Amino acid sequence: MQQFEWIHGAWLGLAIMLEIAANVLLKFSDGFRRKCYGILSLAAVLAAFSALSQAVKGIDLSVAYALWGGFGIAATLAAGWVLFGQRLNPKGWVGVILLLAGMVMIKFA
């Protein structure tokens, strides 16, 4: 396991925020009918992967990717709830809980 440095955690945090932004912008693009939002979404995805590539210099890939994906999904869920009024059914909440539990288990494995 690599030694954790805060700069790599910051890169991972930036990657997560950019992924969330990309997902929200993709929703705003309305299937790329609103091209400006679609292009911004693509740029945010590229920037997210660039930040993730910096994060994995100091964080194990399995841990970084699990945290990036898991927090990205959970935060996108929250953004969808706040911005678009989207709701999960009980099975969806079970999935989110399992996702978060899996992230914790990977981190401590």
Swiss-Prot record:
Forms a complex with MdtJ. The gene is mdtI. GO terms for molecular function: amino-acid betaine transmembrane transporter activity; antiporter activity; choline transmembrane transporter activity; spermidine transmembrane transporter activity. GO terms for biological process: choline transport; glycine betaine transport; spermidine transmembrane transport. It is a multi-pass membrane protein. This is Spermidine export protein MdtI. Signal peptide: none annotated. Belongs to the drug/metabolite transporter (DMT) superfamily. Small multidrug resistance (SMR) (TC 2.A.7.1) family. MdtI subfamily. The keyword Membrane applies. SUPFAM superfamilies: Multidrug resistance efflux transporter EmrE. InterPro entries: Small_drug/metabolite_transptr, Small_multidrug_res, Spermidine_export_MdtI. It comes from the Bacteria. Catalyzes the excretion of spermidine. GO terms for cellular component: plasma membrane. Keywords: Cell inner membrane, Cell membrane, Membrane, Transmembrane, Transmembrane helix, Transport.
